[in-house]
Each structure stands twice: as structure tokens, then as C-alpha cells.
């Protein structure tokens, strides 16, 4: 099973919008995750700990990014945006294996952008 966590041990229930970019030679890229009203920002989670990163967990292990930011509207947190930088073809392959598992577990589909 593939899950996303912001505090280790607590699975995020909200499924994000994920946008991918990749360099022309395929060696690097970015994955931008946007969670609208994620469970981790709920008042009931305040005593669970601090957000220390985004942890992508699956049967192969975990992928970690520390580039995590909250978006506020009228002083209240409404969304989380996390950016994972993919630095090599091997990292890209590993990330895509995670996303295939996560998509399968959460009913997501992949739509390729028109180029």
C-alpha cells in the first residue's frame, strides 16, 4: 500500500492534485503536490506533532521532501503544497513506481499534457 504522510505514522487521507515536469533529456524533474483542506491541518491534529516534511511511503521504502508549505486564506490554513525535486533517471523511475502504487490505491489517473 502506498501512502503520503506529513507527520510520520499519520496517513494523509486527502488525495492531492499532482503536477509533473521533466527536463527534455529526462534526467531531472519536479513533482508538485497540492492538498486542498488536508486532514493534517484539521484542528483535531494539532496535538499530533509538527509537519516535518512529506513522506511518500510504499513497499520499497520512503521518498522524502522537506519543501512543504501551507497556503492560508483569511488567516486559516487551506492547503498544503509540497515540491519533490527529481534529480536523476533512477529517482524518476522510483518516483513513478510510487505514483503507480498510490494511483492504484486511490483511484487516480494520469493525463499527459499536450506538447
From Swiss-Prot:
Cellular location(s): Plastid, Chloroplast thylakoid membrane
Record keywords, A-Z: Chloroplast, Membrane, Photosynthesis, Photosystem II, Plastid, Thylakoid
Gene3D superfamilies in alphabetical order: Photosystem II Psb28
Cystine bridges: none
Subunit details: Part of the photosystem II complex.
Similarity-based family: Belongs to the Psb28 family.
Xref: NCBIfam families: PS_II_psb28 (TIGR03047)
PANTHER family in alphabetical order: PHOTOSYSTEM II REACTION CENTER PSB28 PROTEIN, CHLOROPLASTIC, PTHR34963
Ranges that cross the membrane: none
InterPro entries: Psb28_c1_sf (IPR038676), PSII_Psb28_class-1 (IPR005610)
Top-level lineage group: Eukaryota
Gene name in the database record: psb28
Main localization of the protein described in the UniProt heading: plastid
Database matches in Pfam families: Psb28 (PF03912)
Membrane topology: Peripheral membrane protein
Protein's recorded name: Photosystem II reaction center Psb28 protein
Amino acid at each position: 500500500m502506498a501512502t503520503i504522510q506529513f507527520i510520520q505514522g499519520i496517513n494523509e487521507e486527502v488525495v492531492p492534485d499532482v503536477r509533473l515536469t521533466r527536463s527534455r533529456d529526462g534526467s531531472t524533474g519536479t513533482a508538485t503536490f497540492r492538498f486542498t483542506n488536508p486532514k493534517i491541518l484539521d484542528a483535531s491534529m494539532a496535538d499530533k506533532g509538527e509537519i516535518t516534511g512529506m513522506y511518500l511511503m510504499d513497499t520499497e521504502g520512503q521518498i522524502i521532501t522537506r519543501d512543504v508549505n501551507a497556503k492560508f486564506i483569511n488567516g486559516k490554513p487551506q492547503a498544503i503544497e509540497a515540491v519533490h525535486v527529481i534529480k536523476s533517471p533512477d529517482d524518476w523511475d522510483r518516483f513513478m513506481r510510487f505514483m503507480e502504487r498510490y494511483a492504484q490505491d486511490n483511484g487516480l489517473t494520469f493525463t499527459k499534457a499536450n506538447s
